[in-house]
Amino acid sequence: MSKAKSPIKSSKKSVNQPKSVLREKKVKDAEKAEHISLQGHVDNSDEEGQDKEFFPGFGSSDDDEEDSPNALVNTSRQIMDLGEDAEKTIKKKVSENKNLQKKKGVLYVGRLPHGFYEKQMRMYFSQFGPVLRLRMSRNRKTGSSKHYAFIEFESLDVANVVAETMHNYLLYGKLLQCKVIPEDQVHENMFKGADVPFKRIPHATIARLQHEKPLSKEKADKLITRHNRKLKLKKRKLKELGITLESDVSHPKAASPVASKKSSKKKNKKVLAAHK
């Protein structure tokens, strides 16, 4: 009988190669790895160069997410610059039209990105020309930006150049909407509160102080009378069910005064006086 072949395949024996051949292989592998890493570095630098061409003067940042209403973007000069070519073009346009119109120009700017607030806007748009007044619309309760603002320039020509240059300009992931407002549409209260730091109204503090304010005797009597009337109706209903309830509401005892700091008292008085 013939012997059955074992199911286990025999592994190929490794051929012993001379040391010189192994050294050459190692050198070739190292050169190949170095070439791949250099190629990847060149590709990355090309992508960065393209980004700079399309978006001059802006850097990419991962900190542009909305986290808190008071978060600010990087306002360094490198990020806020328009770029040499754009700045030359703008100055040329302004110099061509500077003798035409001397009246002021008002610009509407919409779709403002998160973190691009009054300080950043003044820094940015001052590159075009002197900014006289600037007001960004904010929520009265929270103080959050409504993402649009009004800017008054010294010259109407500058405002026209800004509207032409910056309309649909990509800024921190948002396309700016710029439009010159005609003089007859500029409202007298459009710049009310401009260049004044926004102060959030402390609604919680005001409500707490109003709640903790001691009641007058007349108001306390009124509250007790109303509560006793409701309690009387409840007693009648419980009596029909066979339950007797003996209780009444009277004037509470005067609470002992709690010692508080003078500074907090003064602060609370100022808060109440400012928002009456």
UniProtKB/Swiss-Prot annotation:
Chain positions covered by the region annotation Disordered: 1-70, 249-276
MF (Gene Ontology): RNA binding
Major location category of this protein: nucleus
Disulfide-bonded cysteines: none
Sequence ranges of Low complexity compositional bias: 252-261
Name listed for the protein in its UniProt record: Uncharacterized RNA-binding protein C1827.05c
GO cellular component: nucleolus; preribosome
Biased composition (Basic residues): 262-276
Assigned keywords, A-Z: Nucleus, RNA-binding
One GO-annotated biological process of the protein: assembly of large subunit precursor of preribosome
UniProt biased composition (Basic and acidic residues): 21-35
Location within or outside the cell: Nucleus, Nucleolus
Organism, scientific name: Schizosaccharomyces pombe (strain 972 / ATCC 24843) (Fission yeast)
Positions in coiled-coil regions: none
Residue intervals of the RRM domain: 105-183
